[in-house]
């Protein structure tokens, strides 16, 4: 599910939507694997609705860090070449730069305190730290349940080349409980 309005590129005729997290939120035992398309951005053909590509920010999300942020579309030079980019500060505390035509991961870095990953690999997949999953006794993790950012509208300035986004630096205790879920 989506929370907010997506973004549209009229030249590529693609719609970009941030997708919510899988359920149940804090017990991933009942939903093994990456939980494809959740906590992701999807690019859809505006006429047919056909999936063009997707990028998953938080595979097997057990911290409620869905990708509800509005994807920001910019055209600018990237490594000496003019590119169509999608930029997004995700709730998981990482900032991402993607090619908005192909979904290719170009860059990512931490923008707020986080304690659950050592960084991102060459494909943008988080390098998770063992023991940061929710537990029956509670696990203290940054960012919090509210994320490093949330549904607040971001803004990009072509003058400064910067993305402006509200940031939260707080942690939460994540508790796992047994749930029946279908």
Task: Outline where the language-model segments fall.
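Repeat-blade elements of multi-bladed beta-propeller folds
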Residues: 1-30, 40, 66-90, 150-155, ...
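Extracytoplasmic/lumenal domain signature
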Residues: 28-67, 74-82, 94-140, 171-182
């Amino acid at each position: 599910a989506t929370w907010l309005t997506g973004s549209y590129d009229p030249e590529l005729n693609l719609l970009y939507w941030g997708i919510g997290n899988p359920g149940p939120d804090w017990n991933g035992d009942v939903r093994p694997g990456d939980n494809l398309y959740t906590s992701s951005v999807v690019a859809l053909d505006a006429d047919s609705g056909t999936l063009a590509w997707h990028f998953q920010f938080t595979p097997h999300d057990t911290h409620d860090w869905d990708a509800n942020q509005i994807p920001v579309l910019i055209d600018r030079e990237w490594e000496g070449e003019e590119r169509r980019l999608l930029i997004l500060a995700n709730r998981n505390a990482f900032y991402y730069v993607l090619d908005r035509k192909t979904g290719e991961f170009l860059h990512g870095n931490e923008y707020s305190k986080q304690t659950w990953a050592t960084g991102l690999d060459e494909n943008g997949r988080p390098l998770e730290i063992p023991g940061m999953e929710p537990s029956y006794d509670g696990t203290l993790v940054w960012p919090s349940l509210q994320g490093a950012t949330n549904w607040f509208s971001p803004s990009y300035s072509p003058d400064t080349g910067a993305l402006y986004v509200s940031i939260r630096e707080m942690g939460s205790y994540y508790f796992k409980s047994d749930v029946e879920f279908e």
